[in-house]
Each structure stands twice: as C-alpha cells, then as structure tokens.
Amino acid sequence: MKTHGLLKAANAVSDAVFCGTTAAFVLVIADDPTGIQSDSVIAAGPVLDALELPWVASGPATIGCDLSRIVARSERLGLPAAIVIDAADASTPAVATDAEPVPPSPTYRRDPVRHLLVPALIRHQRAVLSARLAGTDPPPPPPLPRFPDGIPPRWRPALDRYAPLFRAFAARRSSFTAGDIGISSCYGFPPYDAIDVVTYMGGAIPLAIGAHLAGRTDAWAVTGDFSFISAGHLGLLEAVAREVPLRILLLANGQAETTGGQPVPSSLLDRVLDGYADAIVPLDDPLDEHACEHALKETVSRDELSVVVARFPPP
C-alpha cells in the first residue's frame, strides 16, 4: 500500500500494535516522495514512527534480505512491522536472496488482558507495548474486571438490557468472537467471557473474517448499529466478496451508547442492510432469552453469511 492507504487503515494498524500479533504481520509501504502516483505527498517514515511500528527502508538491491529480516523481527516481537520502498522503484527487478528461516508461529490462545482494547486495560497494554519495543520484560498482567461489579455504574443499565442475549450467546461459545469498542465489549470479562478481541469501531467484522480464513470457521463478530453504519458495513462487503459464511450479531439499540447517546435512525440501518436481505436473521425481542436462543440456533445451522439483527426497544 501507499502511505495514503496506511493513513486510511491507521486505526486498525494502531490497534494491532497494542493487541500484538500471533504470526508475522508486515506492511509493504510504497513511499511516493515526488507525488507521481498520489493526490498529495506524505512521507511514510513519520507516520510509521507515530504508530510505533518497527520499520526499515529498502530498495531493489536489498529488499530480499530486508523483507526476510523484518518478517523475523515482527514474529519475534509479536508486533506489526513495515518495510518502505520508493514507489519509483516498483518496476525495478529485485535481487533474489535466500530467505532466513522463520520459526513456526505460535498457536493463537485467548488472552483478554492483551486483546480487549478497553479503558480498564489500556494502561497495562501501553506498558506491555513499551516493554516489547525496548526489549525488556513486560509487566505482570492485572486481574480482569468481573461483570458486573467491575463495570462503571453508568453503563450497567444498558448492559442489563443486553444480559438475556449474552447469556444465550455465551452458552453457544465459538472458538473466536471479535467485538467493537463499546459497552458490549464488557461481555468479554468473566463470568461471560463471550468476546475474545475488541478493537476499533467497525473492526469486529474484518477481524472475524480473518479468523474464519485462518481456520476458525465458527467465528462470530459482535457489533452495534452505530459502529456498523460508521465503518463495519465495509467488512460486510468484504465477507461477500470473499464468500465467507460469517456469523454477525448486530445490536441495534438506536443510539451510540458509549459516546454520548447520539441517535441512530433505524431507517438508516435498514437502508444499509437492504442489500443483505437473504442474510438477515431477525431478533425482534432480544429481552427474551428464549427468543435469543432460537435466533442464535437458527444462525449456527446456516452455512452462509448470517446477520442476527437484535432490535432493542427504547429504554
């Protein structure tokens, strides 16, 4: 990608830095200092430094060795990394080199202290990132907040409304569930443990697609109407393009609960969902646990893209 593409993906990249990675994750950035292929000139280095990505500049004569080394570095640190080339060199043949052997990637395991990017854990995650970049030992993990006592009181009324749905959802635990930052992310805490990774608004669906393609074929994404309309629907397009039979739980409560309660018109959500009518599994009474169980059971029985739309009544 070019630096402009990196800027568009910066929220996802930054969250990958804080979450860490299981396998190597290397971005190949085409820097365009003369603007021959870009609408503006943006230097890649300062952007990568701001995102705290390890990176190296390379060219046709050294890219083989440099790429091998940056992959190994990403794997060793458990962090994303980048290699920067000049866009003007894109058509220049590279010198072939023997790749350095990279040890097998460790297997993914659930690590909510590291992977739930929520305010209660962000200071620890910041300290872990600093230690990784400095090559020192990370601090010991803090205890996870427990639901509901460890949850801010102002969020509990909204979370209580979600409880019947998440009791049913947790009972059908999949091997991987991605969530968006928001109040529902609290259901990643014990005793529910219903969400494994929480990142930026709109990140749940792309993450779940990646998990599915990596072999977690029962993966779920949990998102809210505000996050879905803001960015998550782009992931739905990707699921269709890749023909991924993903399972999505969409919490439609009609407002941006976490950021101040801004209204989300149901007509706007319906307009976005109109193109996916065959994928919709309606859940019109998410306060009824039996209705939730029925909708989730129907979803897991389908071998196609499925979106459970849980429409909550006004509080």
Feature annotation, model-predicted:
Residues M1-V56, A61-E75, I181-E257, ...:
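Thiamine diphosphate
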Residues K2-T3, P33-S38, V56-P60, H115, ...:
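Hydrophobic alpha-helical scaffolding
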Residues V13-V17, A44-G45, V71, L165-F166, ...:
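Short amphipathic alpha-helical segments and helix-helix/interface helices
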Residues S40, R161-L165, Y200-L207, G235, ...:
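Catalytic-loop motifs flanking and including active-site residues across diverse enzymes
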Residues I42-G45, T97-P101, Y192-I195, L236-L237, ...:
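Short secondary-structure boundary/capping segments
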Residues L53-I183, L283-P315:
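Flexible, low-complexity linker and terminal segments
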Residues A99-R110, D196-G203, P263-G275:
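Acidic, Ser/Thr-rich peripheral helices and adjacent loops at domain boundaries
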